[in-house]
Amino acid sequence: MVFNMRSTRGIFSSFESGYRFASYTLELSPFKTLIKIEIPMCWKPLVCASVLAWSRAIGEFGATLMLAGATRFKTETLPMAVYLNISSGDFEIAIGASLWLLFISSCLLLVLRMINRAV
């Protein structure tokens, strides 16, 4: 969540305040301004920030290892599964988990490119 908060704060701070003030003159509440004006205008950067935050979070290996440890079936994420299976000698499962990580990363990059190309 911290990964996404920095990007989201930057997105909304760069939002032109004239739109916000115009919505206030039309008697929209701040919540309705957010829902009806700001989010529709900033949906692409918000989706990109969320996808990037999710891709960073899925690759968090060091923090998981330091805080939760490497416990099979309890704190096992995909990067942790690669680590645990390589250390136990199950290379086929480690390669499978690595291929899943590559597939997920490729899908995320494809989604980002499709969003950036859409006008």
UniProtKB/Swiss-Prot annotation:
Keyword vocabulary terms for this entry: Cell membrane, Membrane, Transmembrane, Transmembrane helix, Transport
Subcellular location: Cell membrane
Record GO cellular component, one term: plasma membrane
Positions in coiled-coil regions: none
Signal peptide positions (record): none
GO biological process: transmembrane transport
Paired cysteines (S-S): none
A Pfam family per the record: BPD_transp_1
Membrane-topology descriptor: Multi-pass membrane protein
Membership in a protein family: Belongs to the binding-protein-dependent transport system permease family. CysTW subfamily.
Protein name: Putative uncharacterized protein HI_1475
Organism: Haemophilus influenzae (strain ATCC 51907 / DSM 11121 / KW20 / Rd)
